């Protein structure tokens, strides 16, 4: 029972004819081709006939009734088959040489004929008959037939025309004898087609070699195609030139020249008497056209111009009503050829004239732009570009023209701009740039030329432009108004109204520009305005003395509110604010509050120098005799604020080291000593934390051990300091203090414990890590978070490794209560932060690559690995060491490259392993690269393993990629890859290729 789900074959259409039906009925081919839309088409028929023709020579031909019987002689009741083996000996005829003439040669012994059986001969005749129906239009054949089938058709044409078996390409000393089955006229036609196709193939040589091959390549091998494309073209050029100069009549095939074989008539031959005689002009036009195309392709422009002119001349000499059988030149393509050669008879468009003017140093550019103002064919952006180019060329002396040319081009562009909808270029730039020159006459001249050609809508746009110029161009507006009166564009009422508006729009000219004023003081009779101006100056100033002067002025105005309340953004630390508010209301209270608020504001904006300067002035102010009661307390608090700002500045400018770090460390110890001594006044928590972190970055660990661990902000710095102290005392692989480990773990809890300290949370951890600067502290924090990541992820394939990681525990109680996502995000951020300060730390680069690979960011991981390898080789100047790139890292790079679709990069990386894994190599090579940067042949110069190159050669041979195969073979033949070389040469060769490959990876991933 048939499967109901099995798809049924689609029945053929009623009008579809199968190829073998044309063998049975010789007249069917003509009837089929005469249809309006034959199915299959003529091109499809040629493909089918060529595909079904076996490319093998038979030793004998069968009788009409049975092609399977091998008979060594012709039956007695039939005549010989012309040109077929087994017939009567073919008499000798004149030879077909590479030249135009067909010289007669002495008689030779009997030659072999076509060596084809009847099926082969019948199919070849049918394919040539269909090609003749298409008038041997090589453009159509080239467009619709694969290159190999074009060569098969050419081979069959030469074989039938000469009456003997020929191969393509023809040898250089080709002098084949025309047998009885051939014909001199036909051979001449076939040889002409051969040389034409040889030249045409050079134009598409690269595409022909890369074109997909038909599945059945029995009729032409890839090597024969390569040989045909590599054939010298000079003999073909000489042959076609001689043919153009010859006066000998030239015949082409008629459709009836090819007679299909009949099954009942074994003596049927070709009717070479029925051939078209074409005019010499038609022949020369076609040949000169193809010669001109070849000359253009090979950049022989003088010869191309001569050939194109000869083609056009011969084509014009053909009477208009003549039917063309051989010439297939399309007028548009001929015009393109003539334009390419610079001899076109058609008038150039305005854009073409514009481009030609640019090539000829702006010749006639003004007249072209004037014409374009009416036609508007040239893009306005191109005109603007030319204006700027002319300006630059004149200013640098490249263009020996006066500024008048630049002025005329700019004026014409202004006029064109009037009619550009949505243009961003206006007339303001023109008047501003050329104000010192006489810029009005060129503009008026351009407007007068344009006015007669304007439509009503364009006149309205022109009026708006003129009104804008009259009202906004100051001194030149009066002169322009007198000119506009003569245009006849405005009525008298409009002109009067414009005149009145010009009088009203004329402003008094200020002595200095408002934008150049040093302040924004507006002198007014209203005191509120003056007070507001003073307040704005007070808010914006950054100098303590200026603050003092402005406060004195504001105090004189008897303000209704305290002066320290002018700006709500002035924020003062609470201890200092308490002291200041306890002062009596006075100038000193306002001055202290304002300086403290502005200093903190400046420090937030990064202006540390002015902030410290203001606090220093305030400290000096409070040391006066009248402030003796609170001098010591106020100065101590201000000193701590100065220290806080300087610590922040030092951390922000860590690599510049602008401050004395030793002195800064001593002051930090003194500040923390106040907390340890139990003074009544201690620094605020932010200052204590900054001092502790600063000592941690200066590796001053002992002073931190004596502080109270219960102080919330100091918990993390103290735990890190204790860890470093224990690491110095530790002997062997002993686990260190767990305080830092437990504290770090508590940061990543999904729900923080109630009893935990106030330091818990990712935000407080990042606030601490943001101020880490020393490399060792970075390494300790990275190792802890990396260890937490390894334990929570629990995947050996994505384990991270770095320094100090062996110090931490290997397990965590209740790991599900911790957030792996927070760990990954924090570690990713911390590695980026650490690498911004120490970008050449190889272990961190590799760890960041491992982390990116674990989260699926393959490109970023590859970038980190490549950066590590480039850094480890001192930018590819030193050999790659195993401690930089071991097998573990290389295999991860291979995985990244494969995930990115760069299978050739993964293949080359396999050579970096201690022992090449050919299983991975062959798998990657068989994959199709999906990345445009991973061209297979781009990395042949980076391969030093000959086994790998041999596999690549075999792979290209299977795929039919001939040029790539040759390139791989040439790489195998280099001297440094010789298997007999000593080990030193082999190591040097591998090192050079490794360095070359690393540079290629760095160019792709790091630039």
Curated annotation (Swiss-Prot):
<feature type="compositionally biased region" description="Low complexity">
    <location>
        <begin position="79"/>
        <end position="97"/>
    </location>
</feature>
<dbReference type="GO" id="GO:0034472">
    <property type="term" value="P:snRNA 3'-end processing"/>
</dbReference>
<dbReference type="GO" id="GO:0045666">
    <property type="term" value="P:positive regulation of neuron differentiation"/>
</dbReference>
<dbReference type="GO" id="GO:0032039">
    <property type="term" value="C:integrator complex"/>
</dbReference>
<dbReference type="GO" id="GO:0160232">
    <property type="term" value="C:INTAC complex"/>
</dbReference>
<dbReference type="GO" id="GO:0160240">
    <property type="term" value="P:RNA polymerase II transcription initiation surveillance"/>
</dbReference>
<dbReference type="GO" id="GO:0016180">
    <property type="term" value="P:snRNA processing"/>
</dbReference>
<dbReference type="GO" id="GO:0005634">
    <property type="term" value="C:nucleus"/>
</dbReference>
<feature type="short sequence motif" description="WFEF motif">
    <location>
        <begin position="19"/>
        <end position="24"/>
    </location>
</feature>
<comment type="similarity">
    <text>Belongs to the Integrator subunit 8 family.</text>
</comment>
<dbReference type="GO" id="GO:0010628">
    <property type="term" value="P:positive regulation of gene expression"/>
</dbReference>
<feature type="compositionally biased region" description="Polar residues">
    <location>
        <begin position="56"/>
        <end position="78"/>
    </location>
</feature>
<feature type="region of interest" description="Disordered">
    <location>
        <begin position="56"/>
        <end position="112"/>
    </location>
</feature>
<keyword id="KW-0158">Chromosome</keyword>
<protein>
    <recommendedName>
        <fullName>Integrator complex subunit 8</fullName>
    </recommendedName>
</protein>
<dbReference type="GO" id="GO:0005694">
    <property type="term" value="C:chromosome"/>
</dbReference>
<dbReference type="GO" id="GO:0005829">
    <property type="term" value="C:cytosol"/>
</dbReference>
<comment type="subunit">
    <text>Belongs to the multiprotein complex Integrator, at least composed of IntS1, IntS2, IntS3, IntS4, omd/IntS5, IntS6, defl/IntS7, IntS8, IntS9, IntS10, IntS11, IntS12, asun/IntS13, IntS14 and IntS15. The core complex associates with protein phosphatase 2A subunits mts/PP2A and Pp2A-29B, to form the Integrator-PP2A (INTAC) complex.</text>
</comment>
<keyword id="KW-0539">Nucleus</keyword>
<dbReference type="GO" id="GO:0030514">
    <property type="term" value="P:negative regulation of BMP signaling pathway"/>
</dbReference>
<dbReference type="GO" id="GO:0071168">
    <property type="term" value="P:protein localization to chromatin"/>
</dbReference>
<comment type="function">
    <text>Component of the integrator complex, a multiprotein complex that terminates RNA polymerase II (Pol II) transcription in the promoter-proximal region of genes. The integrator complex provides a quality checkpoint during transcription elongation by driving premature transcription termination of transcripts that are unfavorably configured for transcriptional elongation: the complex terminates transcription by (1) catalyzing dephosphorylation of the C-terminal domain (CTD) of Pol II subunit Polr2A/Rbp1 and Spt5, and (2) degrading the exiting nascent RNA transcript via endonuclease activity.</text>
</comment>
<dbReference type="InterPro" id="IPR038751">
    <property type="entry name" value="Int8"/>
</dbReference>
């Amino acid at each position: 029972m048939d499967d109901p789900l099995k798809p049924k074959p689609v029945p053929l259409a009623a009008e579809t004819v199968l190829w073998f039906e044309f063998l049975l009925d010789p007249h069917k081919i003509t009837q089929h081709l005469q249809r309006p839309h034959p199915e299959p088409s003529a091109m499809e028929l040629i493909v089918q006939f060529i595909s079904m023709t076996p490319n093998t020579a038979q030793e004998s031909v069968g009788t009409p009734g049975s092609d399977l019987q091998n008979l060594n002689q012709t039956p007695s009741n039939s005549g010989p088959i012309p040109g077929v083996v087994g017939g009567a000996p073919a008499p000798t005829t004149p030879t077909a040489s590479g030249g135009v003439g067909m010289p007669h040669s002495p008689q030779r012994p009997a030659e072999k004929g076509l060596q084809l059986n009847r099926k082969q001969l019948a199919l070849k005749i049918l394919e040539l008959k269909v090609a003749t129906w298409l008038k041997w239009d090589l453009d159509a054949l080239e467009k619709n037939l694969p290159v190999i089938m074009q060569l098969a058709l050419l081979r069959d044409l030469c074989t039938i025309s000469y009456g003997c078996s020929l191969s393509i390409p023809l040898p250089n000393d080709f002098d084949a004898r025309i047998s009885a089955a051939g014909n001199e006229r036909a051979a001449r036609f076939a040889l002409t087609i051969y040389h034409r196709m040889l030249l045409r193939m050079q134009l598409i040589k690269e595409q022909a070699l890369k074109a997909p091959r038909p599945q059945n390549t029995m009729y032409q091998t890839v090597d024969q195609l390569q040989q045909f494309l590599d054939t010298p073209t000079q003999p073909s050029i000489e042959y076609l030139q001689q043919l153009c100069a010859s006066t000998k009549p030239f015949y082409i095939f008629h459709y009836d020249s090819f007679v299909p074989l009949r099954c009942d008539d074994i003596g049927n031959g070709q009717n070479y008497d029925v051939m078209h005689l074409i005019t010499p002009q038609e022949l020369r036009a076609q040949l000169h056209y193809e010669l001109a195309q070849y000359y253009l392709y090979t950049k022989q422009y003088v010869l191309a111009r001569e050939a194109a002119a000869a083609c056009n001349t011969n084509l014009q000499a053909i009477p208009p009503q003549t039917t063309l059988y051989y010439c297939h030149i399309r007028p548009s393509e001929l015009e393109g050829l003539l334009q390419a050669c610079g001899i076109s008879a058609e008038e150039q468009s305005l854009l073409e004239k514009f481009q030609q003017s640019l090539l000829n140093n702006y010749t006639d550019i003004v007249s072209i732009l004037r014409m374009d103002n009416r036609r508007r064919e040239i893009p306005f952006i191109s005109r603007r570009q030319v204006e700027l180019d002319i300006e630059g060329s004149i200013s640098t002396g490249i263009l020996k023209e006066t500024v008048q040319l630049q002025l005329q081009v700019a004026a014409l562009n202004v006029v064109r701009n009037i009619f550009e909808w949505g243009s961003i270029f206006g007339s303001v730039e023109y008047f501003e740039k050329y104000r010192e020159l006489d810029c009005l006459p060129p503009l008026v001249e351009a407007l007068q030329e344009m006015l007669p050609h304007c439509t009503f809508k364009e006149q309205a746009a022109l009026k708006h432009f003129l009104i804008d110029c009259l009202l906004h161009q100051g001194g030149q507006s009066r002169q322009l108004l007198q000119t506009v009166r003569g245009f006849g564009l405005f009525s008298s009422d409009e002109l009067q109204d414009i005149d009145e508006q010009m009088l009203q729009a004329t402003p008094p000219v200020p002595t200095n520009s408002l934008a150049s004023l040093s302040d924004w003081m507006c002198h007014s009779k209203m005191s509120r305005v003056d007070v507001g101006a003073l307040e704005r100056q007070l808010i914006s100033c950054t100098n303590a003395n200026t603050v003092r002067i402005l406060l004195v002025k504001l105090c004189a105005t008897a303000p209704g509110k305290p002066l320290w309340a002018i700006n709500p953004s002035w924020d003062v630390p609470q201890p200092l604010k308490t002291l200041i508010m306890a002062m009596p209301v006075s100038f000193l209270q306002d001055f202290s509050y304002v300086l403290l608020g502005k200093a903190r504001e400046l420090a937030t904006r990064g202006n540390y120098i002015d902030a410290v300067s203001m606090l220093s002035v305030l400290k000096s102010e409070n040391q006066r005799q009248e402030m003796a009661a609170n001098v010591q307390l106020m100065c101590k608090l201000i000193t701590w604020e100065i220290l806080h700002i300087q610590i922040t500045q030092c951390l922000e400018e860590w690599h510049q080291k602008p401050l004395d770090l030793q002195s800064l460390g001593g002051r930090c110890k003194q500040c923390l000593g106040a907390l340890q001594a139990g003074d009544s006044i201690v620094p605020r928590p932010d200052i204590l934390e900054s001092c502790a972190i600063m000592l941690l970055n200066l590796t001053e660990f002992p002073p931190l051990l004596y502080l109270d661990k219960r102080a919330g902000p100091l918990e993390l710095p103290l735990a890190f300091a204790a860890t470093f102290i224990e690491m110095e005392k530790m002997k062997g692989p002993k686990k260190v203090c767990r305080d830092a480990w437990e504290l770090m773990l508590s940061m990543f809890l999904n729900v923080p414990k109630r009893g935990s300290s106030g330091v818990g949370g990712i935000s407080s951890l990042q606030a601490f890590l943001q101020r880490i600067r020393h490399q060792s502290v970075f390494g300790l924090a990275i190792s802890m978070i990396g260890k937490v990541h390894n334990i929570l992820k629990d995947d050996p394939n994505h384990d991270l490794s770095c320094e100090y990681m062996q110090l931490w525990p290997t397990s965590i109680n209740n790991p599900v209560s911790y957030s792996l996502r927070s760990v990954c995000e924090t570690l990713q951020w911390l590695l980026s932060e650490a690498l911004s300060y120490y970008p050449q730390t190889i272990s961190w680069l590799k760890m960041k690559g491992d982390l990116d690979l674990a989260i699926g960011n393959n490109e970023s991981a590859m970038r980190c690995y490549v950066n590590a390898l480039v850094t480890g080789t001192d930018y590819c100047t030193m050999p790659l060491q195993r401690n930089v790139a071991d097998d573990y890292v290389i295999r991860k790079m291979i995985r990244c490259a494969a995930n990115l679709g760069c299978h050739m990069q993964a293949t080359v990386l396999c050579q970096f392993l201690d022992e090449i894994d050919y299983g991975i190599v062959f798998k990657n090579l068989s994959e199709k690269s999906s990345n445009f940067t991973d061209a297979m042949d781009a990395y042949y110069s980076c391969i030093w393993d000959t086994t790998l190159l041999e596999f690549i050669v075999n792979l290209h041979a299977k795929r039919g990629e001939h040029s790539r195969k040759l390139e791989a073979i040439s790489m195998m033949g280099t001297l440094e890859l010789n298997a007999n070389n000593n080990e030193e040469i082999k190591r040097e060769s591998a090192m050079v290729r490794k360095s070359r490959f690393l540079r290629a990876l760095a160019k792709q991933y790091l630039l």
